[in-house]
């Protein structure tokens, strides 16, 4: 019935045709007892398709926390200090221990240095830092925006040969006049 004329006979006659067909089929499947529950749970009754199995994830809040250290979990400071290898909690809590470093002033200069704790760092003096040298011949500090290039000591001095000569003759380029170069800081003589 690919021809449009064949379809028109159904519309013009206003006839309705009902077709009934019966198909008998037999399917034999063998499954184990463990497979039937997973296959049946994955079948969707609406579509009859097999869906992915639901993935059950365990929640961390339901699980008992695992302690990797042999410390008392009620004393958080001791647990952190054992994990990081810091000083014992007794050095911070009690005042009878002597350390080489003290935040309070003492009248006896040898009171804090008689014992040195094994956890203290050995500080060594450093050489003073020198400022980095500039690897370039020109820097932004040497450039005068009106003239183009200037001397570091006198920013209003024009270097001959950059835009031409100082008087503006020769060189092919246009150079600002010497009046503009010397008055570069005033707002009335700026180039617009």
UniProtKB/Swiss-Prot annotation:
Record key words, sorted: Nucleus
Q: Where is the composition biased (Basic residues)?
A: 52-62
Q: Which positions, given as ranges, span the membrane?
A: none
- Organism in which the protein naturally occurs: Arabidopsis thaliana
Which PANTHER family does the record associate with it? VQ MOTIF-CONTAINING PROTEIN, VQ MOTIF-CONTAINING PROTEIN 22
Protein's name according to its UniProt entry:
VQ motif-containing protein 22
Q: Describe the task this protein carries out.
A: May function as positive regulator of plant growth.
A cellular component term (GO) from this record? Answer: nucleus
Biased-composition ranges for Low complexity?
24-38, 102-114, 175-192
Q: Where found?
A: Nucleus
Where does the record place the region Disordered?
24-65, 101-135, 163-192
The record's misc note reads: Plants over-expressing VQ22 show stunted growth phenotype.
Report motif location: VQ: 76-85
Provide the primary localization. nucleus
